[in-house]
From Swiss-Prot:
Its main location: cytoplasm. Pathway: Purine metabolism; AMP biosynthesis via salvage pathway; AMP from ADP: step 1/1. The keyword Metal-binding applies. It comes from Methanosarcina barkeri (strain Fusaro / DSM 804). GO terms for cellular component: cytoplasm. This is Adenylate kinase. Consists of three domains, a large central CORE domain and two small peripheral domains, NMPbind and LID, which undergo movements during catalysis. The LID domain closes over the site of phosphoryl transfer upon ATP binding. Assembling and dissambling the active center during each catalytic cycle provides an effective means to prevent ATP hydrolysis. Some bacteria have evolved a zinc-coordinating structure that stabilizes the LID domain. Zn(2+) binds at C130, C132, C149, C152.
């Protein structure tokens, strides 16, 4: 089954994608990851992408779609895939439709995790990190001692892009990019919207119910 996974920052997309990978044995394909892998491996498309990345510019769609096409042709995608973080625009969605047609792997379903902005802001702006790799949340999982890591005793901190203003900006960008795509895939009868405010396992049970018809 071939899946596109949508959801704003903080909606739990990564968590649900991991559960789908474990449950169905199909790979999660994150554009950021495969882009970095191609650059690291020095592939022709990776080198083309690196030229733009080194200048701090966005990688053009035609380079990105070539990298995605090559990844989807790999053996582990035979039974399906989860596309995470792509497409982000209507032109990208159109380009994706063309390559999926070429390799005969049409999208079965587009899962859209929906969470109200206020909850997303609380989820993300409450995150705390430590340099040792430990992570906390002011409300849901605070360190035992204020601002001190339970594991190494180091000072915990908030990442710059997790601050409330930055989160609001990220959500605005996401909405501008993704709302047209919600409409695009709704018209094709592919979109299923799920309530991302529910418990992680509850959300996954709903995903499994949706995917049952494609498994």
């Amino acid at each position: 089954m071939n899946i596109i996974l949508f959801g704003p920052p903080g909606a739990g997309k990564g968590t649900q994608a991991k559960k789908m990978v474990d449950n169905y044995g199909i790979p999660q394909i994150s554009t950021g990851d495969i882009l970095r892998a191609n650059v690291r491996e020095g592939t022709e498309l990776g080198l083309a992408a690196k030229e733009y990345m080194d200048k701090g510019e966005l990688v053009p769609d035609e380079v990105l779609i070539g990298i995605i096409k090559n990844r989807l042709k790999e053996q582990d995608c035979e039974k399906g895939f989860i596309l995470d973080g792509y497409p982000r625009t209507i032109p990208q969605a159109d380009a994706l439709a063309v390559i999926l047609d070429e390799i005969n792997k049409p999208i079965d379903v587009v899962l859209n995790l929906e969470v109200p902005d206020e909850e997303l802001i609380e989820r993300i702006s409450g995150r705390l990190m430590c340099n040792c790799g430990a992570s906390y949340h002011r409300t849901f999982n605070p360190p035992k001692k204020d601002d001190v890591c339970d594991i190494c005793g180091g000072k915990v901190f908030q990442r710059a892009d997790d601050k409330e203003e930055a989160v609001k900006n990220r959500l605005n960008v996401y909405k501008k990019q993704t709302e047209p795509l919600i409409d695009y895939y709704t018209k094709q009868g592919l979109l299923v919207t799920l309530d991302g405010t529910k418990d992680i396992d509850e959300v996954f049970e709903e995903i499994k119910a949706v995917l049952k018809k494609f498994a």
